[in-house]
């Protein structure tokens, strides 16, 4: 078993994977009604939860990572924050500007669908983030283009000191790792 966070496992069938993981029309239509309220939204994912108690394996990312990633976009871009700790996100000074909206998603399917409909991504060191961004690259659900040409910003620090995993194949070549 594994997280399969390397497109080298399935690059030869990427279109099929994206098609198979397409969202049900009901969820997709609900998410489209939300996403049209934003102009070129950036998906920003923050994973805390179990990472706070398991930081030796998966450390939560600091606000400095998100600040640096945000600086790679125009300062007026709208950002939708997805997190398992929305209360904490709302308390952070970095996200207090009106351009930030915290998703109060009813479930992970809706959050993943909304993420995949965004124009650009700032991902956490999380399989949920990774898949949300990867599925959007060539999303098969119209009316998205057949090729995703947005930015994906990913953290260089993916694992903690207890896990000495090689991450060279973790990120697609067009993702920006900081």
Task: Mark where each language-model region is.
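Secretory-pathway luminal glycosyltransferase catalytic domains
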Residues: 1-72
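Short, solvent-exposed polar/charged micro-motifs at secondary-structure junctions
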Residues: 7-8, 90-91, 162-165
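Short linear motifs in intrinsically disordered/low-complexity regions
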Residues: 12, 20, 26, 51, ...
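Residue-level marker of intrinsically disordered, low-complexity segments enriched
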Residues: 15, 78-79, 100, 174-176
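Compositionally biased, intrinsically disordered/low-complexity regions enriched for serine, proline
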Residues: 38, 142, 152, 169-170
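Conserved beta-strand scaffold positions in the cores of enzyme catalytic domains, especially
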Residues: 43, 99-100, 152, 175-177
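Donor-binding and catalytic core of enzymes assembling or modifying cell-surface/extracellular glycoconjugates
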Residues: 73-160
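Leloir-type glycosyltransferase catalytic cores
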Residues: 158-178
């Amino acid at each position: 078993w594994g997280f399969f966070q390397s497109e080298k496992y399935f690059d030869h069938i990427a279109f099929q994977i994206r098609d198979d993981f397409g969202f049900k029309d009901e969820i997709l239509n609900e998410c489209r009604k939300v996403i049209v309220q934003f102009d070129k939204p950036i998906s920003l994912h923050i994973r805390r939860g179990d990472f706070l108690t398991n930081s030796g394996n998966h450390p939560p990312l600091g606000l400095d990572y998100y600040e640096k990633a945000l600086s790679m976009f125009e300062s007026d871009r709208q950002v939708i924050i997805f997190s398992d700790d929305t209360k904490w996100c709302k308390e952070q000074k970095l996200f207090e500007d009106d351009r930030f909206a915290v998703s109060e998603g009813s479930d992970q399917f809706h959050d993943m669908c909304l993420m995949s409909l965004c124009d650009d991504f700032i991902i956490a060191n999380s399989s949920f983030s990774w898949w949300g961004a990867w599925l959007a690259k060539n999303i098969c659900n119209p009316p998205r283009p057949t090729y995703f040409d947005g930015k994906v910003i990913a953290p260089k620090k993916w694992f903690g000191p207890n896990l000495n995993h090689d991450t060279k194949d973790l990120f697609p070549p067009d993702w920006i790792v900081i």
